[in-house]
Amino acid sequence: MMQVRVLPFGVLRDWLGASSATVELPEGATVAELLERLSAGQVPPQSAQLLRSIAVSVNAEFATSAQELRAGDEVGLLPPVSGGAAPAEKTRVGGGEEQPRTALLTHAPIDAERLIAAAKKGEDGAVVVFDGIVRNNSHGRRTLYLDYEAYEELAVKQMRELTREAIERFGIRDALIVHRLGRIRVGETSVLIVVSAAHRGPAFEACRWLIDTLKKTVPIWKKETFVDGAVWAAGEPFPAGLSVAPPEASHEG
């Protein structure tokens, strides 16, 4: 037998009742077998159902249902999300110290003006910005604040990969994604994307692609608190190839 560490995120953490747990499995067990074991345990019906449409990571890398697990592996359970190398130059997110560019997570307020100004270079003809802010209502309910959490190691990897792909796909010069974590009030920036390019067309296209893809693939979750309650945002399902599901029961007999 072997033991693996399971890390549920977002609504799964609320339903499963722990930020991490150790699960004992037979040697050579797969991700699918782990999910089957969890689904068969004492979990709420809605949790067991959601386990059939999540993504799973093993040691901060996306995994397939067929991947074999090893003793000591860290397995992330990732419900649908809300929502190259980094250049050497650095930038400030808020009032803290400078950090490597392209992909940043921060608990500090995002200083959008500073980041946009830092993105402009002499060879650029356009800088396109997506500034996602917290609005005061959602689906007819008055919003008090949002709380964001992330599987931080995997989220930064995915964000860096998105900026690298955007540069290659759209021919832009540079891109930066900054996402806020923790509690965010109405009117504050939750996510900032800044794209720099010689021409406006590629800059617009890259910026739209970055936010749309981030909302589907980066493990960041949003909990919305209203005047009359709180709920985890349903979010975007993971695309085919990232989501996993335990195998259906065999009908052979």
Report each predicted region and the residues it spans:
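Ubiquitin-like/PB1-type beta-grasp interaction modules and other compact soluble beta-rich domains
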Residues: M1-E98
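N-terminal, polar/charged subdomain of small-to-medium soluble alpha/beta proteins
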Residues: R5-F9, R13-W15, E74-S82, A86-S190, ...
